[in-house]
């Protein structure tokens, strides 16, 4: 999967959304939302995310109901991983006499606070010299967040919808990630079965 937007607010939130569906056309069918992870059941945070999903389902014509009487059960799950650290090597042409004059592209070693590592970039003979190095290594953490949504028909237990939205971000804050993943999931809902699409959610306007 390609690396998606890394900024939390400055750039659009990009998510890859996969959906498989056999949903009937909305005709007032009722639904109830439950936590796929029992640890989230009854939680205030889960309730806020479930409310966002309910709003989206109502927009397309479904009606919320209690779990005992609903036509469909919507299972909601979400998570963000521990993240992976990435390094970006920045080069300043003002301090590099070889910038654009015969430098050649190959992997080389730089030393970071986590030890030596290979970095792809332009080789410079002054990299290990006593002069000021024209390179700087930026380190940051990339987190992968996902949202899983399933809809089952209560009468016979038939699976009607399976959807997954996944995004990479420099933020690991669920209150930021989950609402964006919900919006991505319901963009063009229910979608074409078996299709994975890239959804961009515009960043919030600064006030």
Residue ranges of predicted features:
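Soluble non-cytosolic domains of exported or imported proteins
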Residues: 40-51, 68, 172-180
């Amino acid at each position: 999967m390609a690396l998606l937007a890394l900024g939390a607010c400055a750039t659009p939130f990009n998510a890859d959304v996969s959906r498989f569906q056999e949903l009937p056309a909305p005709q007032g069918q009722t639904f109830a939302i439950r936590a796929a992870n029992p640890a989230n059941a009854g939680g205030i945070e889960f309730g806020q995310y479930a409310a966002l999903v309910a709003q989206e389902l109502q927009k397309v014509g479904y009606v919320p109901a209690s779990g005992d009487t609903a036509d469909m059960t919507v299972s909601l799950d979400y998570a963000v991983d521990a993240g992976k650290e990435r390094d970006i090597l920045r080069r300043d042409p003002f301090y590099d006499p070889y910038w654009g004059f015969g430098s050649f592209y190959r992997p080389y070693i730089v030393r970071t606070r986590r030890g030596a590592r290979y970095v792809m970039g332009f080789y410079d003979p002054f990299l290990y010299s006593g002069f000021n190095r024209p390179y700087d290594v930026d380190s940051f953490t990339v987190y992968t967040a996902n949202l899983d949504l399933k809809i089952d028909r209560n009468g016979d237990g038939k699976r009607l919808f399976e959807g997954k939205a996944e995004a990479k971000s420099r933020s690991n804050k669920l209150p930021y990630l989950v609402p964006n993943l919900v919006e991505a999931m319901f963009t063009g809902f229910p979608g074409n079965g078996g299709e994975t699409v890239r959804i961009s959610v515009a960043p919030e306007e600064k006030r």
